[in-house]
Amino acid sequence: MAKADFYETLGVSKTADEKELKSAFRKLAMKFHPDKNPGDAESERKFKEINEAYETLKDPQKRAAYDRFGHAAFEQGGMGSAGGGGGFAGGGFSDIFEDIFGEMMGGGRGGNARGRSTGGRERGADLRYNMEISLEEAFTGKTAQIRVPTSITCEVCSGSGAKPGTKPTTCATCQGSGRVRAAQGFFSIERTCPTCQGRGQTISDPCGKCHGQGRVTEERQLSVSIPSGIEDGTRIRLQGEGEAGLRGGPSGDLYIFLSVKPHQFFQREGADLYCSVPISMTTAALGGTFDVTTLDGTKSRVTVPEGTQPGKQFRLKGKGMPVLRSAQMGDLYIQIQIETPQKLTKRQRELLQEFDQISSKENNPESTGFFARMKEFFEG
């Protein structure tokens, strides 16, 4: 049966550039990959055709020869012949990302995005731990004890994965490189060795405790130092306290994500604190004093001058939060709220009415001026 046109196979025009070729190939390769269509001979055949078409057209020299002579350019043995199975057979579906799309995922033919390196050494995974602290703890700082479930190096086999007294052996399939080449038409593709999964070694007699993994799960207790002045959303990194690496690989890191609980009285903005304090109408009018307990446990006196208005702020210098890793302190801002009296007695009502009758514009300049300006605006 005559071969299909390579451009038609990929669904692109004969003027398609490299970007268009790659985009079309990725879409079709994902659709027809044998691992997504197990047992489907037609999908496997289609996948091989797509592979062959792309490998030809992405190479400028091969593409030029194909454009001039068609399939005849490669019919005399040319650059190789199809090998048994070839392509990605035997590999997991993730191989398509590792072998074809490696450059997109930070990998490449010397390793992959999962941290595996030549010889099978693999970095352990990073871990995340969420911790909630109070504003007082953020103010003073603290040392917290936490328990984290993680994977640690197996003590029985020292991380080798092999039963004590035995050793892993060099993989016979890839000769220890962790990579193999598979023929596909007139080209070859390098991919992860399916026998050793890229480790370069195989274990014939695995460790009984870790079952050949080289690490076991355990809950560890760690001490975390939280400095004073720490802010909500801060991330603390504990290097090497993540999961143990595989086959001698380095451990991952543990990241502590801190959140500071809302406080009943104080709101925080950077190193400054804000607190709303309600005072009586008479205190606002006549003046007075009140005490505020700050986060450090001390009391600070606030003097309210006569005629204080709602929203007035008083600054208590140095009574805010510590500035992280500094000797400086933020400030505490007291914002005044004036409470209107409720459930008045008859006598209280009479006195307020009398006060209102004898009040002048000078007593309420803002409200008097506001209504005068409004009247002038609308009536002209």
Curated annotation (Swiss-Prot):
Alphabetical list of InterPro entries matching this protein: DnaJ (IPR012724), DnaJ_C (IPR002939), DnaJ_domain (IPR001623), DnaJ_domain_CS (IPR018253), HSP40/DnaJ_pept-bd (IPR008971), HSP_DnaJ_Cys-rich_dom (IPR001305), HSP_DnaJ_Cys-rich_dom_sf (IPR036410), J_dom_sf (IPR036869)
The cross-references to Pfam families, in alphabetical order and at most eight, read: DnaJ, DnaJ_C, DnaJ_CXXCXGXG
Q: Where are the CXXCXGXG motif repeats?
A: 154-161, 171-178, 193-200, 207-214
Query: Which cofactors, if any, are listed as required?
Result: Zn(2+)
User: Which residues are Zn(2+) 2-binding?
Assistant: 171, 174, 193, 196
Q: Which molecular function GO terms apply here?
A: ATP binding; heat shock protein binding; unfolded protein binding; zinc ion binding
Q: Which SUPFAM superfamilies match?
A: Chaperone J-domain (SSF46565), DnaJ/Hsp40 cysteine-rich domain (SSF57938), HSP40/DnaJ peptide-binding domain (SSF49493)
Q: Where in the cell is it found?
A: Cytoplasm
**Biological processes annotated in GO:** chaperone cofactor-dependent protein refolding; DNA replication; protein refolding; response to heat
Keyword Chaperone in record: yes
Q: Where is the J domain?
A: 5-70
Q: What does the similarity note say?
A: Belongs to the DnaJ family.
Query: What's the domain remark here?
Result: The J domain is necessary and sufficient to stimulate DnaK ATPase activity. Zinc center 1 plays an important role in the autonomous, DnaK-independent chaperone activity of DnaJ. Zinc center 2 is essential for interaction with DnaK and for DnaJ activity.
The entry's protein name is: Chaperone protein DnaJ
Record organism: Allorhizobium ampelinum (strain ATCC BAA-846 / DSM 112012 / S4)
